[in-house]
């Protein structure tokens, strides 16, 4: 997997709190276990006026022309609450989101996002308010998320955020659970070689 060090991207402001995983990816689309193909269903019930997903909702922020191609999602508190479905971060990643900024995230969603190489950045409510004001007032507004320096930069300002060292290491080096395991492939092979034949 590709590591995440710094990313500068267009920002889409989703001005809503307590956005749950059923809103992020509705249950009718949870019919496969591949990570790919969920982006087209992201926020389906908000993005579209019909069940088939053919009539975009012109009122929904992600359908506005100025936010097309956004790779950073700005949201309010408790983003990703609700069920623990990993399809929610799959849909965001498949859509093209690389980082999310909010005052808080649901715990399981937070971990699942990191496992899918997206950076969930927690800033204070005041800092998030400042970013909303900047993004909503500035067409083409971009934000830089610097995981190496643990900084967010926007509109000439710099904001600090925290992430635990282990998760930061995994993101910087593009490691998921399988990748972490494969780092010890030689030790695993040596252990298996020592297993008595009658136990194999």
UniProtKB/Swiss-Prot annotation:
Q: Residue span of the signal peptide, if any?
A: none
Which Gene Ontology terms describe the biological processes this protein takes part in? L-leucine biosynthetic process
Q: Which reaction does it catalyse?
A: (2R,3S)-3-isopropylmalate = (2S)-2-isopropylmalate
Q: Which CDD domains match?
A: IPMI_Swivel
Q: What does this protein do?
A: Catalyzes the isomerization between 2-isopropylmalate and 3-isopropylmalate, via the formation of 2-isopropylmaleate.
Any coiled-coil regions, as ranges:
none
Q: What is its EC number?
A: 4.2.1.33
Instruction: Fetch the Gene3D superfamilies from UniProt.
Output: Aconitase, domain 4
SUPFAM superfamilies recorded for this chain? LeuD/IlvD-like
Instruction: Identify the keywords attached in UniProt to this record, alphabetized.
Output: Amino-acid biosynthesis, Branched-chain amino acid biosynthesis, Leucine biosynthesis, Lyase
Q: Which InterPro entries match?
A: 3-IsopropMal_deHydase_ssu, Aconitase/3IPM_dehydase_swvl, AconitaseA/IPMdHydase_ssu_swvl, IPMI_Swivel, LeuD
Q: In which pathway does it act?
A: Amino-acid biosynthesis; L-leucine biosynthesis; L-leucine from 3-methyl-2-oxobutanoate: step 2/4
Its family remark reads: Belongs to the LeuD family. LeuD type 1 subfamily.
Citing just one GO molecular function, the answer is: 3-isopropylmalate dehydratase activity
What does the subunit comment say?
Answer: Heterodimer of LeuC and LeuD.
The lineage's top-level taxon is: Bacteria
Q: Which residues cross the membrane?
A: none
The name on file for this protein is 3-isopropylmalate dehydratase small subunit
NCBIfam families linked to this entry: leuD, PRK01641.1
Question: Which HAMAP family has this protein been placed in?
Answer: LeuD_type1 (MF_01031)
Gene Ontology terms: cellular component: 3-isopropylmalate dehydratase complex
